[in-house]
Amino acid sequence: MFFITVLLMGLAGLFGLAADAVIQKENKVVQEIKFNPVYCFNKPSEKLILRPEFIGCIIGEDEPLGQSEIKEGTERPTQLHPQLLARFHSAQAAAKAEGVTMTIDSGYRSLETQNYLFQRAIKEHKTPEEAIKWVLPGDLSRHPWGLALDVNLNHDKSGASWLEANGATFGLCRVYENEWWHFEPLIAPGGICPPLMPDASHLK
């Protein structure tokens, strides 16, 4: 299994404490420290780091994974959401440590590209009702929001299988039963992914 480094910075330096840390003195508990962990991808070590919320991710050294589901913003982006990219980088490094390769084969798409893919799917599947099971139109898809990844679609499926098994740690979830390659940041890192939907036509 991959390793998660947990760090707590105290006033005097760094202590290796868990999220519910206990300080002991002469074998007696004198104080219990509780903190909400912040998930960060530490670029120098290529490891997932849990830092205390009051410290946060280190600017220039960490990529923050965010503390909740990543939702659409108010303006259309032109690239993948940075926190989604940080989540993938963190998972990718953990998978690499186990000898598994993960690749983003498709991520951000413009509205025009997404609508083109939907129209192409209609021609392939004969009706919009069938096409939408595989490709959503631009106004419904999360690809144009920079919030969806197609992982290892054109490569070894083992990378996507690894991410399905371990992605919740990084806040990444497989979404559809009929698309083993499609992942979205549906939960906070360390949460529980929702049940798979049969296909995209069941999207609410």
Language model features by range: what are they?
Residues 2-107, 111-204:
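Extracytoplasmic cell-surface/polysaccharide-interacting catalytic and binding patches
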